[in-house]
Amino acid sequence: MKDKILWLSLNKFEVHKMDRTIQMKYRPDKEEITLTIYIKLLDDEKTLEFSYENAEGLEIENVRLLDDSLWITDSEDGYIIVPVREGLLIPSNSGRTFIHTFETFSYEGCHMEMLGVVKNRSAILITWHDPYVIAEVKSTLNSSAVQAKQILSLSLDLRKTAKAFKITFLGNGDYITIARAYREEAKKKGWFKSWRQKIREVPDAAKLIGASNFKLWSCLDRRLDYRMNEKSVTVNWTFEEVTKIAEHLKKDLGIEKALFVIGGWIHRGYDNQHPDILPAAPECGWNERLAEASKRIKNLGYLFCLHNNYQDIYRDSPSWSEDLIMKSQDGQLVKGGFWAGGQAWLICSKMGLELAKRPQNLPKVKELFNPNAYFTDTTFAAGLYECYDPKHPLTKWDDMKYKQELCNYTISLFGVFGSECGREWAIPCSHFFEGLVGVSGRYFHTLDPESMGARVIPLFEMVYRDCIAIYGKYGYDYSRAAEYIIYHIVIGRPLHYHTWSRGLYWEKAPKDEPQGWPYDSSCFIRADNGWAEGLCMIDRFIKNTHEVLSPLHEITAETIVTKHEYLTPDFRVEHVVFGEDVNVVVNKASGEFGRIFGYKDYVYNSKIAGEVILPPYGFVIESPTFIAFHALSWNGVKYEKPVLFTIRSLDGKPVSESRITKNKSFSWIWRVKNKN
């Protein structure tokens, strides 16, 4: 059988029934070896487990047990859900043809070990527990095999250690039903770890609840070309300026909760000479100034977080050694990306853990600066790797193990820990993900939902919301970010503020900055007649959005999304319920020429405030202790222009009977009606 590829057909199997199991055995002609497939009905009476085993001598490269199966036609009101970033719903009536693969735990692949299928309001959950599973979603138009305009189908490839998957029939249901079922499965796998457990172990983790993510990416920005020649060295912020920015956020803008992250603090700057990080960048103030920054920023009540990397190494790093680097099957060094420090090479995760533990690395960072949070770049973002160096071989399972050990070691030193993007295998050993929500102000990085006619849904919030803080990553244009803000309101997550001007930005802001327009994507930089009037654009945007998203996260962090629905046929208006009593309605319509939805107000009948008129990018949040809206009318009051307004209980009692704080971000006229 060596070097022989077999395509197995089900009609050549010997089929046997054994109690609750169907056994299908394949024997190639004139061969003694066998492949056996099992289909077992589990004790819950609604789950089928598919598995296989191969006889000794038969090497399996790939088994596709589902091949264009579980298909749905355009007339069957169906869809497939994929857990990529927040979640993707791919309908069976999009009119598009495509084939898209989602590899388990890869970049924009399946970030959870599951898929869901709904057909005529009947739901099934597909689960597995192995990183060597690859899902394929296929859409075919006008197939001759079935009388349908479109067929949406699913395939699963099992490779190497992947031997099984399960299909659970959930009966009448939708993607919320599927998410609830998978949440219980995640607990059985050991991926689930709640906020309560994490805060009990690391009390500072509570500071993430309601915290926005403020990140100064490159304090020192050193650029090399492909020949490792230095092109430029730029100081964007000294450590003293870093401190003043944090103090400005707290004292001038009133930002109470923040995850304050700095990158480019290491010896040669951002993405340079890893893993040789010390002393801190001399151009920015050396160790002494960074230690002072850490102390002062922590004294603000913030999480002070340092950005680091134990996957990339550069040829000019003092620790450079080919012995550290992953090897491909043909023995070649494995390349990473081309970053500020030039061509990066990928450190084997076993060796990366050893480097992190060196006295001059994380232990010394703890001793010198004592941050109360830490971030390791790329640890969760990159897919799980294999290494073929005989000195430190890795399977994907091994790579996961060593990365989890790096997380837990970092937690043991600093407390709060996070990394890039996020995968469910990292939930038990981290406190925040940076990048799972979105990338550069968009829902995805390279994946294009429109190519599949797909919609983003808050799937992650239905499964793991009460386990971890999650953010987007990279900079974006604050003056055109309204849709991104509305998306964050739907998922109830604080924003990431990663776009900054050099130095003390508010002192250097130009006089002619855009002021925003009420009905387009610049609406959240407005401040006319509001609290933020007179501030620079960055500060207006921060204040307007933080005052909505921070308290929304605070009151919902330990709940899950229990309801999500579209209130209009074009999907522009969404209704979300967190837990039992936090209701959110958003209008994603745009007032801008050429946008997908076009200008349209939406009238929402609120139980609290009666008729609420939501303009393009309007929203209303209603709960017993927090109310916020961007609306043209609320509680019987009509406004000439959309108003952004928040009302919050200060004592935990319902707003109608408590001491409250009011924040008017922009308006022409405003009132608050209160029983008291």
Model-derived features: where do they sit?
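Short acidic, gly/pro-rich beta-turn/loop elements at beta-sheet edges
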Residues: 60-62, 73-75, 270, 314-316, ...
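Glycine-centered flexibility motif
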Residues: 83, 269-270, 285, 466, ...
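Residue-level recognition of well-ordered secondary-structure positions
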Residues: 51-53, 250, 298, 305, ...
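Aromatic-lined carbohydrate-binding/catalytic grooves of carbohydrate-active enzymes
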Residues: 207-358, 367-376, 380-391
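Active-site-proximal substrate-binding groove within the catalytic cores of carbohydrate-active enzymes
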Residues: 129-134, 139, 153-169, 173-178, ...
